[in-house]
Every structure is written in structure tokens, then in C-alpha cells.
């Protein structure tokens, strides 16, 4: 019995020694940590970060130029301030990788699908033909918005009654309709079973990510294997999308060299990208799903934040409505018209400044050892990010940074400098979409879609919060930010511009 006890104590001693050696030789140990950093107790820091990421990121930002926060299985290095954001943006792709950082933080190979994670065919399509053809595609987006709102809003709102609406759920369904009008077209973009599949998938990614990130790295392949949502979505979406793919490919083959009548839309661009990279066409289904995740999850959150602000600050509705009415009367429902809505653009950018989708941005994984300008050494394998929310609430860059000022960016714009402060643009002080060449490529499509939806709402509905309810606080889980589930009251207006 004594021998067994001695073996146990010896084993514990060896483990403790290994932990101490690992901790004392950790190449990130020289970087200040927010919370306990010693072995074992660092898990307490990870728990605190899960529950209180906002305050932890703010604390680190105001204390240090570079600091680190704890996840379950690793440290994440965070840089503070606009200058460091810019420095991180400029590190060459030979030394850091955005894609590998996204893989680690979002666990794409488990939460999305392994094929499209390895061969992201959607990225060049979004960055290239989708963005170039937004003007031509925009009428379809507007048409779907005009059809979807009357169908999906509660009937009582049409009778002029105030009705409570679950904004995030309803906006998610409308975003999915408008986005899939571009992704897969009519009539599939209105198919209830298909839409249920893509919407559930879009919101399952966050759930899967939370589960995976809570598991130690060694167990993640096992946990990931049993996560059902991505596999189910690929299977169910394939039932609807694969016949379209086969039809397109068949027509291309029948046409031979004469491709003058070839479809010019998102689905065809994905097919062409898959063929160009010699991928099985099943990857196109995954590309459609990833596109839906990016469109539905982020856009439904963004427009929900904007609507909560619109309902909480009703004094700003009239100037927005007057701007939208005047521009629509002159230019119609066109992409050009949306671009001229400077006040609406400012309102939504300000909403995004205070209520982005994440408290961090400009994520990178170090591929080769680098040293930052302040002397901080980052070894290969380090995850490094910028503190987005803390930057956006820094009084060095924004006057009264904690206050929602809807026309803050409108007041900064002039005819000669109209573009720099528009919603879609990034800067070292505004990193909601990332910054630099790895900034979100879909932001041009998303911003135009969201502004069209907001313009439609402002012209067709009055909105307000329930009596005695103020703008609810956002919900933080880890560094991920979501709008609260508070309902917003809607009432259809009798006088509106068509």
C-alpha cells in the first residue's frame, strides 16, 4: 500500500515538475496576462474571460500596449490601439495567416465543413464577381425585401396595431431570403425547407464553436466528429442545391465552346471556381452554406443592433426618413440611391462601432517568429488579435466614445472626402470588418443589403421599445457579441414611399 502511495506521489511530482517547466519556459510568459497565468489556475482566467471578456479586454487595453488573455487551451495575444492595429495589418502574409487564425478561433473544420475550409471557393467569388456585379444584382435584393417583409412580419402590424416582434429571428429570416435570392435565385430562395436548413446552420456555427473551444485540443477531433449540425446541413442543403448544380453543368457541357447564354450568377461563379481548382462539385453545396453563415449570422445581428438603436432613440427617425424619402423619389431603389444615404450609413456604422459581432478583430496566426515595434516577441504558432471594441470606445479616436451619436460619421464626411468614413470602409480606428486586404470581403454586399432593409423599415414602419424598456445591454460570450433578445414593437405606416 505504501509503495502505491509512493508511486502516486512520484507521478504527481513529475506532472507538477513538467507543468512548472512548461510554464517557466513558455515563450509568451514575458507578455502581461490579465488574470492568473500559472498552470492549472490559468483555467480560472479562461472561465473569467468566457464570462467577462468585455471588462477583461478593456482592462488589458488600458494597461498595456500588448497583453494576453486565456482560452481553454491557449493564450491569445491582444494588441492595443490604432497604431498597433495598423502594425498588425502590415505584417506580411509570409509571417502571419488570417485563414489559420480563423481556423483556430472559429474551428472551421468542425463547425463548417472540412472541404470548403481547405479550399474556400466562396472567397474569390465574393471578392471578385459578386462585388463587381452588385449594381446589376441589387434589383433582385430589393425585390426580395419587398416580398419578404409583408410575408414575414406579423399580420397585426399591417392593421396599424403595435405588435411585438422577435427582431433577430425575423431579420434572420428576411436576410436569408434576400441573400439567397443572390446565392441560389428563385424559387429556391423562398423554399421553407431550404431556408430552415441554412438559417439553422448559420446559427449552429456559434454553438459548435463554443462546444469545440471548451474542449482541450487533444479531444477536439473526437468532439467535432459527433457534432451533428454541419453534416446535417450539407446533407439537407444538397437535396435542394445539387439538382441546380447538375442542371447548370449539363447546360455548360451541351453548349460546348458557345457559352454566350451561360448564367452569370453566384451559383455559376461557385461552380466555375470549383472546376478551376479541380474540386468535386459537392464542394459547391458547402460554399453555399458558408456564404449563408457569413450573411445570415453577422447581418441579422448587425441589423438587430441598428433596430434596437432606432427604437431606443426615436428622435433620430425623422431625419433618416426625410433623407431616404428624398433620395428614393429622385433615384429609385437603386444601389446608387443607397450610396447617397449618408445619414443612414452613419447611423449603421455608429451602431456597428458600439455593437460589432466581436470584441476582437484583425486576427492572425504567426507562421514565423516576429518581433513587434515595442519589442514584444511572438513565436511561431501564436494567435494575435486587435482589441476591436476597446479601440472603438477609445476617447483618443472618438469624442464621447460611450455615447451613441447616430450622425457622428455623417458630420465627418465632406464632398471631397466622402468615402473614408462610410460604413463599408475600414481604418486603424474602425476594425469591425477587420482591416487591410484580409478585411471581410462580403462587407460590400452585406452593407448594401442591410441599408436597403433599414431604409425599407424606416419608410414602412414605426418602431419603438416596450413601455419602460431602455436599450438592452449586449450579450458577451467569450469575445463574441450578440444583441439581447428584447422584442421591438412594429406598426405599419399608412403613408410611405414606394
From Swiss-Prot:
Biological process annotations from GO: secondary metabolic process
Domain of life: Eukaryota
UniProt membrane topology term: Single-pass membrane protein
Enzyme class: oxidoreductase
Alphabetical list of Pfam families matching this protein: p450
EC number per UniProt: 1.-.-.-
CDD domains: CYP503A1-like
Keywords for the protein's UniProt record, in alphabetical order: Glycoprotein, Heme, Iron, Membrane, Metal-binding, Monooxygenase, Oxidoreductase, Transmembrane, Transmembrane helix
Compartment(s) of residence: Membrane
Record: residues binding heme: 440
InterPro entries: Cyt_P450, Cyt_P450_CS, Cyt_P450_E_grp-I, Cyt_P450_sf
Keyword Membrane tagged: yes
Carbohydrate-modified residues: 425
GO cellular component, one term: membrane
Pathway(s) it belongs to: Secondary metabolite biosynthesis
GO molecular function: heme binding; iron ion binding; monooxygenase activity; oxidoreductase activity, acting on paired donors, with incorporation or reduction of molecular oxygen
Keyword Nucleotide-binding: no
Family statement drawn from the similarity comment of this UniProt entry: Belongs to the cytochrome P450 family.
Its biological purpose: Cytochrome P450 monooxygenase that is able to use dehydroabietic acid and testosterone as substrates for oxidation, suggesting that the natural substrate(s) may be structurally related to steroid compounds.
Name the record gives this protein: Cytochrome P450 monooxygenase 110
Organism phylogeny: Eukaryota, Fungi, Dikarya, Basidiomycota, Agaricomycotina
Amino acid at each position: 500500500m505504501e509503495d502505491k502511495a509512493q508511486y502516486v506521489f512520484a507521478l504527481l511530482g513529475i506532472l507538477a515538475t513538467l507543468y512548472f517547466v512548461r510554464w517557466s519556459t513558455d515563450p509568451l510568459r514575458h507578455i502581461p496576462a490579465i488574470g492568473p497565468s500559472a498552470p492549472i489556475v490559468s483555467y480560472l482566467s479562461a472561465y473569467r474571460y468566457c464570462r467577462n471578456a468585455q471588462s477583461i479586454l478593456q482592462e488589458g487595453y488600458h494597461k498595456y500596449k500588448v497583453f494576453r488573455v486565456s482560452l481553454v487551451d491557449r493564450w491569445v495575444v491582444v494588441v492595443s490601439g490604432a497604431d498597433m492595429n495598423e502594425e498588425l495589418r502590415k505584417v506580411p502574409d509570409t509571417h502571419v495567416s488570417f485563414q489559420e487564425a480563423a481556423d483556430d478561433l472559429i474551428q472551421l473544420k468542425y463547425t463548417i465543413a472540412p472541404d470548403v475550409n481547405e479550399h474556400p471557393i466562396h472567397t474569390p467569388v465574393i471578392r471578385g464577381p459578386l462585388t463587381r456585379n452588385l449594381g446589376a444584382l441589387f434589383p433582385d435584393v430589393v425585390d426580395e425585401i419587398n416580398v419578404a417583409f409583408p410575408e414575414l412580419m406579423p399580420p397585426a402590424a399591417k392593421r396599424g396595431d403595435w405588435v411585438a416582434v422577435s427582431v433577430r429571428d425575423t431579420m434572420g429570416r428576411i436576410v436569408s431570403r434576400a441573400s439567397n435570392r443572390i446565392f441560389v435565385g428563385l424559387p429556391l430562395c423562398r423554399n421553407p425547407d431550404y431556408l430552415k436548413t441554412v438559417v439553422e446552420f448559420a446559427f449552429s456555427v456559434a454553438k459548435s464553436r463554443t462546444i469545440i473551444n471548451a474542449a482541450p485540443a487533444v479531444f477536439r477531433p473526437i468532439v467535432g466528429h459527433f457534432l451533428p449540425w454541419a453534416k446535417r446541413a450539407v446533407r439537407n442543403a444538397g437535396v435542394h442545391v445539387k439538382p441546380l448544380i447538375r442542371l447548370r453543368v449539363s447546360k455548360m457541357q451541351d453548349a460546348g465552346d458557345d457559352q454566350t447564354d451561360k448564367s452569370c450568377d453566384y451559383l455559376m461563379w461557385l461552380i466555375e471556381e470549383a472546376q478551376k481548382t479541380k474540386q468535386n462539385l459537392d464542394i459547391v453545396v458547402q460554399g453555399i452554406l458558408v456564404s449563408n453563415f457569413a450573411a445570415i449570422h453577422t447581418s441579422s445581428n448587425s441589423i438587430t443592433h441598428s433596430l434596437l438603436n432606432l427604437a431606443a432613440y426615436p428622435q433620430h427617425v425623422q431625419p433618416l426618413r426625410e433623407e431616404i424619402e428624398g433620395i428614393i423619389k429622385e433615384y429609385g431603389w437603386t444601389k446608387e440611391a443607397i450610396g447617397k444615404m449618408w445619414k443612414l450609413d452613419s447611423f449603421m456604422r455608429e451602431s456597428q462601432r458600439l455593437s460589432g459581432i466581436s470584441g476582437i478583430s484583425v486576427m492572425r496566426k504567426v507562421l514565423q517568429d516576429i518581433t513587434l515595434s515595442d519589442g514584444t516577441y511572438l513565436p511561431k504558432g501564436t494567435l494575435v488579435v486587435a482589441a476591436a471594441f476597446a479601440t472603438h470606445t477609445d476617447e483618443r479616436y472618438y469624442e464621447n466614445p460611450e455615447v451613441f451619436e447616430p450622425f457622428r460619421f455623417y458630420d465627418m464626411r465632406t464632398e471631397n472626402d466622402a468615402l473614408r468614413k462610410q460604413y463599408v470602409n475600414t481604418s486603424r480606428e474602425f476594425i469591425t470588418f477587420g482591416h487591410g486586404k484580409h478585411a471581410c470581403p462580403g462587407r460590400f454586399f452585406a452593407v448594401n443589403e442591410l441599408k436597403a432593409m433599414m431604409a425599407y423599415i424606416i419608410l414602412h414602419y414605426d418602431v419603438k421599445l416596450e413601455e419602460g424598456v431602455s436599450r438592452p445591454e449586449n450579450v458577451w460570450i467569450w469575445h463574441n457579441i450578440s444583441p439581447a433578445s428584447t422584442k421591438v414593437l412594429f406598426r405599419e405606416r399608412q403613408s410611405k414611399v414606394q
